[in-house]
UniProtKB/Swiss-Prot annotation:
It comes from Mycobacterium tuberculosis (strain ATCC 25618 / H37Rv). One of its GO terms (molecular function) is hydrolase activity. Catalyzes hydrolytic cleavage of carbon-halogen bonds in halogenated aliphatic compounds, leading to the formation of the corresponding primary alcohols, halide ions and protons. It comes from the Bacteria. This is Haloalkane dehalogenase 1. The active site is at D123, D250, H279. Monomer. The keyword Hydrolase applies. Residues 47-176 form the AB hydrolase-1 domain. Keywords: Hydrolase. GO terms for cellular component: peptidoglycan-based cell wall; plasma membrane.
Amino acid sequence: MDVLRTPDSRFEHLVGYPFAPHYVDVTAGDTQPLRMHYVDEGPGDGPPIVLLHGEPTWSYLYRTMIPPLSAAGHRVLAPDLIGFGRSDKPTRIEDYTYLRHVEWVTSWFENLDLHDVTLFVQDWGSLIGLRIAAEHGDRIARLVVANGFLPAAQGRTPLPFYVWRAFARYSPVLPAGRLVNFGTVHRVPAGVRAGYDAPFPDKTYQAGARAFPRLVPTSPDDPAVPANRAAWEALGRWDKPFLAIFGYRDPILGQADGPLIKHIPGAAGQPHARIKASHFIQEDSGTELAERMLSWQQAT
């Protein structure tokens, strides 16, 4: 497996991202160890919050949520998935599988020995994080899903998703910053768009971002479907606190909270919300998300 590592110079002077880098080696199956980057802010002995990003972003997406969460006494950790941010980037699309992503993040949890975690997930962070919650529930104390879901090839896949999948596969460029701008209610300033572009000096660094859309299980014969269906069954027994905060302006996932709230026992009686935000809800409403999380945690 050939691997690229984005030069550190690409991450200098980013708008609103003053966090020191941290690294740990992770593994998946028989793959070589890869270096995963993560933010680690707040007191080391504080109650841990883990923030998982998705496509095509990185921990930069959480830059407005990390300060208020850590200031409230939490240890806030935000990893960059393999292929994204400051983490290592295998160069072939075929190097990335759904299972490997789950195993890489699981390895990160294990190496940091994280327990009693409040796990916040969005986009592909939910596809990975909900699997981890179902398979390693002893590590997770609370779940928050924002504009996410757990696909198991049941029901119809929205047409806009297939448009996005085709774009990611065939477009000669994959402009992360512009894509984030397209998926928000508010215009994203140029300096912030540059922050999303920083991990990808050129297209050779983008195999992970190209791979993600095609890894979403949309047919029953997808290799990820059995594990996802087992995870969905396990979530049907999840009685720990579960919160859904969705941006209703998201054209693909804006109403995907309903099945989660109905299925997960721990969702009963929680202050779920749909707010004026689009797919990248952290970019639209990061401060509000942090405030809602903190008040909810105090109550649970």
